[in-house]
Amino acid sequence: MSDQRRKSAGRRKYTPRRKVCVFTAEGIVPDYKDIKRLQRMVSDRGKILPRRRTGTCAKYQRKLNVAIKRARHLALLPFVSENTRG
């Protein structure tokens, strides 16, 4: 009897919620001038976050990469964070 309780009282399996592409849902295109939105797609070290982490679809991930690189080139977004600078 106690064995059955232990098995049923085990941990529940974690099922991650499916991430929805923000750009598709809101109907917008990634723009290099939208710094707030671009900063959410960049890690604290300054790296571009992957699709599996942000939930963006392939089409908008490619456009997002171009927008982030363009914003970096125009000095709207830093290449690295303040913490990693020497």
Swiss-Prot record:
| GO BP | translation
Annotated GO molecular function terms are: small ribosomal subunit rRNA binding; structural constituent of ribosome
List, alphabetically, the Pfam families matched. Answer: Ribosomal_S18
Query: Keyword annotations for this protein?
Result: Ribonucleoprotein, Ribosomal protein, RNA-binding, rRNA-binding
Query: Which GO cellular component terms, listed alphabetically, does the Swiss-Prot or TrEMBL entry include?
Result: cytosolic small ribosomal subunit
Q: Which InterPro entries would you find in this protein's record?
A: Ribosomal_bS18, Ribosomal_bS18_sf
Q: Does the keyword Transit peptide apply?
A: no
PANTHER family from the UniProt entry: 30S RIBOSOMAL PROTEIN S18 (PTHR13479), SMALL RIBOSOMAL SUBUNIT PROTEIN BS18M (PTHR13479:SF40)
Role this protein plays: Binds as a heterodimer with protein bS6 to the central domain of the 16S rRNA, where it helps stabilize the platform of the 30S subunit.
The UniProt entry's sequence similarity note says: Belongs to the bacterial ribosomal protein bS18 family.
Assembly and oligomerization: Part of the 30S ribosomal subunit. Forms a tight heterodimer with protein bS6.
Identification of the protein by name: Small ribosomal subunit protein bS18
Q: What is the lineage of its organism?
A: Bacteria, Bacillati, Chloroflexota, Chloroflexia, Herpetosiphonales
